[in-house]
Amino acid sequence: MKIVHTADWHLGKILNGKQLLEDQKYILTQFKQHMEKEQPDLIVIAGDLYDTSYPSKEAIGLLEETIEYLNIELKIPIIMISGNHDGRERLNYGSKWFENNQLYIRTQLENIDDPIELSGVQFFTLPFATVSEVQNYFKDKQIETYQQALNECLEQMSSSIDNNKVNILIGHLTIEGGKTSDSERPLTIGTVESVDMHSFRLFDYVMLGHLHHPFSINNSFIKYSGSILQYSFSEVNQSKGYRVLDIENNQLLNETFVPLKPLRELEVIEGDYEDIIQERIKVKNKNNYFHFKLTNVSHITDPMMKLKQIYPNILALSNVVFDHSENFSHVEIKKQDDQTIIENFYKNMTDQHLSQVQSDKIKHLLSFILDREG
């Protein structure tokens, strides 16, 4: 049995005001082409199909088009669960009759001890749920942490584990010690959200969503697929793609990560404004999404507009005005007069020298203060 594991599509994502639907459509078209060649026996989508619980009609249309092609045209069974970004009710709509085409949508805790069995493999689903939702489901107010909530869910699943079969868990959560990214919305406020990886010993393999780095943790049987695109500048240079797991005769044979190539990558470029404008600093692709961190910007009128003429998809510009290499030690500062200290501070903060008029005014003020104190 060949299983493809993906997650965190975040359809409808907006990054720094830029709608990413074009990029998402491009990457999902590529994903569909890969599935034509892979011909998997199952696709698992481990949550966060949408970026918001109220997705746009364009985002809904893209998901429907993609799932219809994979499930109806290619006839690939699909199991998907809801993540913390998804609107559970919207995603769950029509789920009962979709199962006639082997499209299994699991968004409710009521199904956690009812595994989906395909080709002799049991797939347990654990959609995202808050601690309070788990409290209410089990009618147990003693559940106060994510670890306790997970333990209750796993305890209920344990009665359905068949040790004569391969048992796989599909979940949307944070493993303790996993690498995080800026684009991941916290699962909770005020509660530790990570769980111990040793909690999953019941299972032969665990397929997760939520963390966007495909190598968030180093574990042979617990894997994140990662997101399909770079969704924050903290994910620069991260490979994005999907995982493939092969099972034969109740044995996990091998697992591989398959990268996808995006329409545009995210780049963070540091340097001097003039070097960027004159294209003296090399970038991977001028059409990528950029965050420029530049010096000598403060005196430029509308630098963003000027940069966009060369780099049309710039999303962020930071004015780097303080160079730590020019810091002065306490000893050096004590050796300087007040006028020099002020002039150096102004230069460090603005990348400009005081004008003669400004310098004269400061000299006058310092003289006035010293005279008053004397």
UniProtKB/Swiss-Prot annotation:
A single MF term (Gene Ontology): 3'-5' exonuclease activity
SUPFAM superfamilies xrefs: Metallo-dependent phosphatases
Family of the protein in this entry: Belongs to the SbcD family.
Cysteines paired by S-S bonds: none
NCBIfam families in the record: sbcd, sbcd_Staph
Pfam families (UniProt xref): Metallophos, SbcD_C
Protein name: Nuclease SbcCD subunit D
Entry's Gene Ontology BP terms: DNA recombination; DNA replication
Function: SbcCD cleaves DNA hairpin structures. These structures can inhibit DNA replication and are intermediates in certain DNA recombination reactions. The complex acts as a 3'->5' double strand exonuclease that can open hairpins. It also has a 5' single-strand endonuclease activity.
Residues that span the membrane, as ranges: none
Record keywords, A-Z: DNA recombination, DNA replication, Endonuclease, Exonuclease, Hydrolase, Nuclease
Native species: Staphylococcus epidermidis (strain ATCC 35984 / DSM 28319 / BCRC 17069 / CCUG 31568 / BM 3577 / RP62A)
InterPro entries associated with the record: Calcineurin-like_PHP_ApaH, DNA_Repair-Maintenance_Comp, Metallo-depent_PP-like, Mre11_N, SbcCD_nuclease, SbcD, SbcD_C
Assembly and binders: Heterodimer of SbcC and SbcD.
Gene3D superfamilies on file: 3.60.21.10
